[in-house]
Amino acid sequence: MSGAGVAAGTRPPSSPTPGSRRRRQRPSVGVQSLRPQSPQLRQSDPQKRNLDLEKSLQFLQQQHSEMLAKLHEEIEHLKRENKDLRYKLIMNQTSQKKDGPSGNHLSRASAPLGARWVCINGVWVEPGGPSPARLKEGSSRTHRPGGKHGRLAGGSADTVRSPADSLSTSSFQSVKSISNSGKARPQPGSFNKQDSKADVPQKADLEEEPLLHNSKLDKVPGVQGQARKEKAEASNAGAACMGNSQHQGRQMGAAAHPPMILPLPLRKPTTLRQCEVLIRELWNTNLLQTQELQHLKSLLEGSQRPQAVPEEASFPRDQEATHFPKVSTKSLSKKCLLLSPPVAERAILPALKQTPKNNFAERQKRLQAMQKRRLHRSVL
């Protein structure tokens, strides 16, 4: 009974223990189940990040490639437009050259698309607009006291300057459009500096050209009277253009902008007659120079010949005056006489001739002798 009671007494405390053990084991199982899952989550986080980064990189690469393709398309389009503009400029230049200075000023419709402002006499003007000379003269006419005389003077000045202004605008358009086709638009200050630097050599050339042509015409005797008249007219026109440009610079009164003077070929196109005259002048000057050179050569040769003749004549006198005395051979010793025998007793030997045949034969003989010596030594 006691054993049963003990057993019965022992059962109730044992009953709560397994329940408590079970309750304690449940959270432990959950903790155990969570512990192995934590490294899996840690491993999944960098994988997701890598995937996200790869996706973002692919997206950026696609955007970059699309932008590059668009930029290349724009570059090709701009190149085509540039070619078209150059073609139009060339065609406009050819049409302007065909028209010449006889036509009116350049209209805005005929001006090229890439034309820019042009600096003429220190003033920026549109290529198709009125010239600065006309603007200044229009303002000066209102202030002139003499009514009809002033208008006539202004009209004559306009007639003289209109071809020069039209040619200057066309030439500056062609030069600047070609040079600045692939560049940005420069500032007007840089143009002013370049114009002020280029004015000095242009002025010197313009002042020297008429003087040189006049001097050549005076010197050359074979030039015809018509050529002289045409050249004189061209020089007078150049002088008149110079005077008009200086008068314009004084009227402007702007010391910061020096007057700009164009060379004669740009103001007035050369004709075939003028080219022929220049060629004749150059040919005649060449002939004169060759004649002068020949004359100078003859003078130099004539001045050198009389000096050479007395020198040649003086040589025999010196030879006659400088005769060496004969030395007697009696006082000399016999040994010296034996060492220097007379020319007749000397034996003249023939010159040695070395031919390839002789050399080959000598080599063969030497080889045979060497072989005989070796055989003799080997036998002994």
Curated annotation (Swiss-Prot):
Q: What is the top-level taxon of the source organism?
A: Eukaryota
Give the residue ranges for region: Disordered. Answer: 1-51, 89-108, 128-202
Q: Does the keyword Coiled coil apply?
A: yes
- For the keyword Iron, the answer is no
Which InterPro entries does this one have? CCDC74_C, CCDC74A/CCDC74B/CCDC92, CCDC92/74_N
Basic residues compositional bias: what residue ranges?
Answer: 141-151
Q: Which residues form a coiled coil?
A: 47-93
Composition bias type Polar residues, residue spans = 34-44, 165-182
User: What Pfam families has UniProt attached to this entry?
Assistant: CCDC74_C, CCDC92
Which keywords describe this protein according to UniProt?
A: Coiled coil
- Listed name of the protein: Coiled-coil domain-containing protein 74B
Provide the taxonomic classification: Eukaryota, Metazoa, Chordata, Craniata, Vertebrata
